[in-house]
UniProtKB/Swiss-Prot annotation:
It comes from the Bacteria. The gene is garA. Monomer. Binds via its FHA domain to Kgd, Gdh, and the N-terminal region of PknG. Residues 76-125 form the FHA domain. The modification Phosphothreonine is found at residues 20-21. The keyword Protease does not apply. PANTHER family: NUCLEAR INHIBITOR OF PROTEIN PHOSPHATASE-1. Keywords: Phosphoprotein. It comes from Mycolicibacterium smegmatis (strain ATCC 700084 / mc(2)155) (Mycobacterium smegmatis). It holds the Pfam family FHA. Phosphorylated on Thr-21 by PknB. Phosphorylated on Thr-20 by PknG. Phosphorylation at either Thr-20 or Thr-21 prevents binding to target enzymes. Disulfide bonds: none annotated. This is Glycogen accumulation regulator GarA. SUPFAM superfamilies: SMAD/FHA domain.
Amino acid sequence: MTDKDSNLGADQSEDVTVETTSVFRADFLNELDAPAAAGTEGAVSGVEGLPSGSALLVVKRGPNAGSRFLLDQPTTSAGRHPDSDIFLDDVTVSRRHAEFRLEGGEFQVVDVGSLNGTYVNREPVDSAVLANGDEVQIGKFRLVFLTGPKSDDSGSNA
């Protein structure tokens, strides 16, 4: 008898419970997030050195966790296409998945017709203005959005 055959009986392993119980899966995801959040602490401390008006995306979870992407252009593309500014090489990512746009001093993420959608803080969005610490999910990649110092041209004249 193979391991595959033995799963047909009443034997319930933890792996089966994790895969079939959504409540446990939600708890499991929260547990997974805790150690991953610790990995972004170094990135947060490096934010002070960012150019004014720019931002940083840090891959918190996914095939290239720990990677950092500087957002310093009016539009930054993300997707599985090799010409994307942020190349996310995984089948869960559309070739042209999302864009990060800087408009009026604020960054927003815009889904550009992806198959699996774009999420901000686990909520599906077509577009959303990003705040410091927001989590953007593109396919299986989770990226933390970190802002640099604001460029303050108004009211700073002495």
